[in-house]
Amino acid sequence: ISIRKSGKETQIQTDENTIVFVPEHVTMTVNKGADKLAELSVNNTTLDINSLKFDSEIALKTNADYTWAVHVDISPSEAVASASMEIASANIVSVVAGLQLDASKVNPQMTEDDLIASILSATTTSVVNSQLMVAGTAPKIQEMIYALNNINASTDKEYAIAEAAVYNQYMDVNMQYTGDGVPFASVEAQPYLEYEYSYGDTHYEYYEVEPVIVFASDNSRYSFEEYFNEADFGNVLQ
């Protein structure tokens, strides 16, 4: 394994005794003998603590012709991350996620939950490949976080039901064929029984929340695992 750095370095003082140097370019190469197995590169990294701006491009290439690329751009008002996966230069899937921010509301005395709820105002996400697109928005992140933090439930099942209801109230996610623009299904949250057991005379049940695909044509419901299986949707997986 070899690591190289180049370009301008940004100094960040994390505390009175520690200074971190962030290089503009970093490349890590993994070799086995004379063969290059993989190369990870971080390029065009810019960081400005005073203006709260960050930008960087990350790429991972393997000798099997797989490439993963990520671009992150953060400012006081917006954070955007895009990612893509390619095989032999053919795009397999692309992801774009955006957050609307208000960095002026940052207060060092805030708890982590209050900090997140205060600076985030909305989010958008899209996942696209050559055939399918999943797009989602959550325009009231602050209200959603507060609603999740204030769930009052006496059992695990009641909590999961309430949690799913909050997600469904504040998030809008749909599926459509790439280039079509017409949603054929929505994505909703639903509670499910993860596992259960009995100990003596007491029975225990533990619930979680999962996304499910709800088709507009017949209101049928499928988990992501059920729908995106190799037998029924192999061409998308390929």
What kind of feature is each model-predicted range?
Residues 34, 64, 89-91, 179-181, ...:
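Solvent-exposed strand-loop boundary residues in beta-sheet-rich modules
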Residues 25, 117, 129, 141, ...:
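Intrinsically disordered, low-complexity regions
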Residues 75, 175-177, 215:
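Acidic/polar residues at beta-strand termini and the immediately following turn/coil
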Residues 85, 91-202:
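Long, charge-rich C-terminal accessory regions
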Residues 1-90:
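Long, acidic/polar, low-complexity amphipathic helices and coiled-coil-like
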Residues 54-63, 85-87, 112-122, 205-212:
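Short, surface-exposed secondary-structure junctions/capping segments
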Residues 1-19, 185-238:
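N-terminal "mature head" segments of proteins
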